[in-house]
């Protein structure tokens, strides 16, 4: 039995864990307090590993980033960044239009307040930026961690190849630890689902359904409205034939593999059939699999604002704009590990003074809905890589 279960995919295990958790909560509610330990251990593991994960992944990706390989790379990168920003803005609008409530353990955290003005926000950001790096990691100050990782990464871009390789090896080692933690997800989710449904009942299903609807709806909006607008402006023509071709031949494959990296060969093959210059595609598509994460920006923004709404924190427009920028920067590091967008939610939550403990509960909620969320997110991310690459190549041929 255990051997059969070990051969199942993580998605299948999570689905089984959710079903078992709901069943135990409805049939044996008196047992659920004993199952809470599984969920607590899972959240504690995520909370412990997240700071070093963010630091190492961002530092390694920036230190090893190479530019100048192709004349067409700059406009592709511009599309990547603009696309992620617009995706984050769309997520803000969707979250305001359809606010979601999460079931969180907020005992002793009811005094949370957002900064009162833009000046307060910028002051808090600056103070977080210049935090002691060791203290930032130990206290899970994700803004400080991000600042030091970016700064050191930029400084190490001129270091030797050996040093860069060491950083890459450390990044792979941290990712391996994360994979072990994620492998424990079905057990942790089983405990979390059982306790949540025992406490809140079937109303939890409605909450998760609305959260999923906002997430998936926003991603579809980005895929079918935002991306076509950007591509249309680039190629100065009807974008939808190219959009649908990329969604069909790249997005569907990525939906089931749930890995942008695994979908790189599919995208390179599609780019070749679309007549894209190989010197452009060979750089921009692997680069896109690393930094182009519009779906991750949506996930980070929606779940952060759902947390803010749940805790009753008032936020203004300026804060939301800053959140969109932070979500975009965070999304660039989301490719380092499975479920990376979820593990970077604490970075955005820290903008609102939300503790790491609560943020990790939100990550756990994200794990529960990740069966659909992660697949759709990957489909959007990966199909956008080849879409924007092809669009820039078409524009280049038009100008030549």
From Swiss-Prot:
It is found in: Cell inner membrane. GO terms for cellular component: plasma membrane. Pfam families: SDF. GO terms for molecular function: amino acid transmembrane transporter activity; symporter activity. GO terms for biological process: serine transport; threonine transport. The keyword RNA-binding does not apply. It is a multi-pass membrane protein. Signal peptide: none annotated. The chain crosses the membrane at residues 14-34, 48-68, 76-96, 136-156, 177-197, 211-231, 285-305, 311-331, 349-371. It catalyses: L-serine(in) + Na(+)(in) = L-serine(out) + Na(+)(out); L-threonine(in) + Na(+)(in) = L-threonine(out) + Na(+)(out). Keywords: Amino-acid transport, Cell inner membrane, Cell membrane, Membrane, Symport, Transmembrane, Transmembrane helix, Transport. The keyword Transport applies. InterPro entries: Na-dicarboxylate_symporter (IPR001991), Na:dicarbo_symporter_sf (IPR036458), Ser_Thr_transp_SstT (IPR023025). Involved in the import of serine and threonine into the cell, with the concomitant import of sodium (symport system). Belongs to the dicarboxylate/amino acid:cation symporter (DAACS) (TC 2.A.23) family. This is Serine/threonine transporter SstT. It comes from Acinetobacter baumannii (strain ATCC 17978 / DSM 105126 / CIP 53.77 / LMG 1025 / NCDC KC755 / 5377). The gene is sstT.
């Amino acid at each position: 039995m255990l051997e059969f279960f070990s051969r199942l995919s993580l998605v299948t295990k999570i689905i089984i864990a959710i079903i078992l958790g709901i069943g135990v909560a409805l049939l044996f509610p008196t047992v659920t307090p004993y199952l809470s330990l599984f969920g607590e251990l899972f959240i504690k593991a995520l909370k412990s590993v997240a700071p070093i994960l963010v630091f190492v992944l961002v530092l390694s990706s920036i230190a090893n980033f190479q530019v100048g390989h192709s004349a067409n790379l700059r406009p592709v990168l511009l599309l990547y960044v603009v696309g992620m920003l617009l995706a984050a803005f769309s997520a803000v609008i969707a979250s305001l239009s359809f606010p979601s409530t999460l079931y969180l353990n907020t005992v002793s955290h009811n005094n949370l307040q957002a900064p009162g003005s833009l000046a307060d926000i910028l002051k808090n950001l600056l103070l977080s930026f210049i935090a002691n790096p060791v203290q930032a990691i130990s206290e899970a100050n994700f803004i400080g961690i991000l600042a030091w990782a970016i700064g050191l990464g930029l400084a190490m871009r001129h270091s030797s190849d050996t040093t860069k390789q060491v950083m890459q090896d450390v990044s792979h080692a941290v990712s391996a630890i994360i994979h072990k933690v994620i492998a424990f997800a079905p057990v942790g989710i089983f405990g979390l689902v059982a306790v949540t449904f025992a406490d809140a009942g079937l109303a939890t299903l409605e909450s998760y359904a609305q959260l999923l609807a906002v997430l998936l709806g926003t991603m579809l909006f980005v895929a079918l409205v935002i991306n076509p607008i950007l591509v249309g402006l680039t190629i100065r023509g009807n974008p939808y034939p190219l959009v649908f071709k990329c969604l069909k031949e790249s997005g569907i494959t990525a939906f089931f593999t749930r890995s942008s990296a695994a979908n790189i060969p599919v995208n390179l093959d599609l780019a070749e059939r679309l007549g894209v210059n190989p010197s452009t595609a060979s750089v921009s598509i692997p680069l896109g699999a690393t930094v182009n994460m519009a779906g991750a920006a949506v996930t980070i923004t929606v779940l952060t604002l759902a947390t803010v709404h749940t805790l009753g924190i008032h936020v203004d427009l300026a804060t939301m704009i800053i959140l969109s920028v932070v979500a975009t920067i965070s999304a660039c590091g989301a490719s380092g590990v499975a479920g990376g967008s979820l593990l970077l939610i604490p970075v955005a939550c820290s903008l609102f003074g939300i503790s790491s403990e609560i943020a990790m509960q939100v990550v756990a909620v994200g794990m529960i809905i990740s069966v659909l969320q992660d697949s759709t997110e990957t489909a959007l991310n990966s199909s956008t890589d080849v879409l924007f690459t092809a669009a820039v190549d078409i524009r280049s041929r038009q100008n030549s």
